[in-house]
Amino acid sequence: MKYDVVVVGSGVAGPIVARDVAKAGFSVLLVDKKPAIGTPKQCAEGINVNVFKEFDIPYDKRFINREIYGARIYSPSGYTAELRYDKVSGVILERKVFDKMLAYYAAKAGADVWARTEVIDLLRKEGKIMGVKAKHEGELVEIEAKIIVAADGVESTVARLAGINTYAPPHEFDSAYEYEMIIEGYDPDLIHLWFGNEIAPRGYVWVFPKDEDRANVGIGINSDNEKTAKYYLDKWLKENNIPTKKILEINVGLVPVGGFVRELVKENVAVVGDAARQVNPVHGGGMYEAMKAANILAKWIVKALEEENLELLKNYTKEWWEVEGPKMERLLKLRRAMEKLTDEDIDVFVQLLGGTDLEKLAGGNYFEVVKALMKHPKVLMSKRRLEILKALL
């Protein structure tokens, strides 16, 4: 069988590529190795509300658990900073439904969709990549394609088979552990984030409300830590007297927080999303970045097919680095600075930060925030804090 494009992986990036290319009239096959697209989830499920309009996704209550109005962060000593809007700023998704619906939208646009289909090798003829070999419901199939998209996650098989260098050292990954559980006592209109070296080394604990008394409660820490993410999460729950006898779901995962893939295309294979390490280095969220990259990639796939010139595919790398690269590099720089903070530093900065500051930091636009902080006596008194901030400018 033959297709113009085979997209491997049906998270958030893959279906958007498949949908947009199919809309342009080209034949597309979207495959995913899981028998049920969207499971298991490996995500806190929070996303900015603007993505629906930006990426032409229906605002469908079937996959929206809760609308969110802001965020509250907590320092090691209990100081807080809050960002609260008068209108909805984000939503907590039901990823099992959301991912499946993205695949549905791709199918409605004209793409074929196969679940329980695992790519095991690339199809090569005379040294050229001509498609993929896959196990589809247990049977070996060969699928020819002009372009192959590796959207198959952090351990991308397709990228490795194509020879795309996705290597990153262990330090560039976070280990995440999450409970979906019954929990009370936290404002369900906000997401909640706790920082501290004893709480979550290099990361944070989160509570993302899915209902009035149900939330994703998780943690991300450096993956090369000698203790596990589960250890730190259970410790935090115990210290905060939060019962752990009403756990509805457990999810674990490895999150890339650096090591961006430099060359996103090799021959006729393009890598996108977690497979390309396109994840916000500060908070570890990858849905928006995956969608943005998928949007750019789909545009260049369509142009390459329309003009019958696969060399145009390389413009995906160029455009992503021009549009998203500078922001991602700034966020990585911010993360490196955050890694040097002591708990006392975190206490000081949380006390000094306002809601507008939090918004700028989350978006990577931290220059104004840093300059303002550097003038504060509590920062000027500390040579180390001053040096950390100076390194960001």
Curated annotation (Swiss-Prot):
Keyword Repeat: no
Cofactor binding mode and count: Binds 1 FAD per subunit.
Coiled-coil annotated spans: none
Domain of life: Archaea
Pathway: Membrane lipid metabolism; glycerophospholipid metabolism
EC annotation from Swiss-Prot or TrEMBL: 1.3.-.-
Major enzyme class: oxidoreductase
Cross-referenced Pfam families: FAD_oxidored, GGR_cat
Keyword Lipid biosynthesis recorded: yes
List of residues binding a 2,3-bis-O-(geranylgeranyl)-sn-glycerol 1-phospholipid: K327, G363
GO terms of molecular function: flavin adenine dinucleotide binding; geranylgeranyl reductase activity; oxidoreductase activity, acting on the CH-CH group of donors, NAD or NADP as acceptor
Catalyzed reactions: a 2,3-bis-O-phytanyl-sn-glycerol 1-phospholipid + 8 A = a 2,3-bis-O-(geranylgeranyl)-sn-glycerol 1-phospholipid + 8 AH2; 2,3-bis-O-(phytanyl)-sn-glycerol 1-phosphate + 8 A = 2,3-bis-O-(geranylgeranyl)-sn-glycerol 1-phosphate + 8 AH2; CDP-2,3-bis-O-(geranylgeranyl)-sn-glycerol + 8 AH2 = CDP-2,3-bis-O-(phytanyl)-sn-glycerol + 8 A; archaetidylserine + 8 AH2 = 2,3-bis-O-phytanyl-sn-glycero-3-phospho-L-serine + 8 A
Cofactor(s) it depends on: FAD
Record GO biological process: glycerophospholipid biosynthetic process; membrane lipid biosynthetic process
Residues bound to FAD: A13, D32, C43, A44, G46, R95, V119, D274, G286
Entry keywords, A to Z: FAD, Flavoprotein, Lipid biosynthesis, Lipid metabolism, Oxidoreductase, Phospholipid biosynthesis, Phospholipid metabolism
An annotated GO cellular component: membrane
Record SUPFAM superfamilies: FAD/NAD(P)-binding domain
Extra facts: Reduction reaction proceeds via syn addition of hydrogen for double bonds.
Chain's role: Is involved in the reduction of 2,3-digeranylgeranylglycerophospholipids (unsaturated archaeols) into 2,3-diphytanylglycerophospholipids (saturated archaeols) in the biosynthesis of archaeal membrane lipids. Catalyzes the formation of archaetidic acid (2,3-di-O-phytanyl-sn-glyceryl phosphate) from 2,3-di-O-geranylgeranylglyceryl phosphate (DGGGP) via the hydrogenation of each double bond of the isoprenoid chains.
Family: Belongs to the geranylgeranyl reductase family. DGGGPL reductase subfamily.
Record's protein name: Digeranylgeranylglycerophospholipid reductase
Species annotation: Pyrococcus furiosus (strain ATCC 43587 / DSM 3638 / JCM 8422 / Vc1)
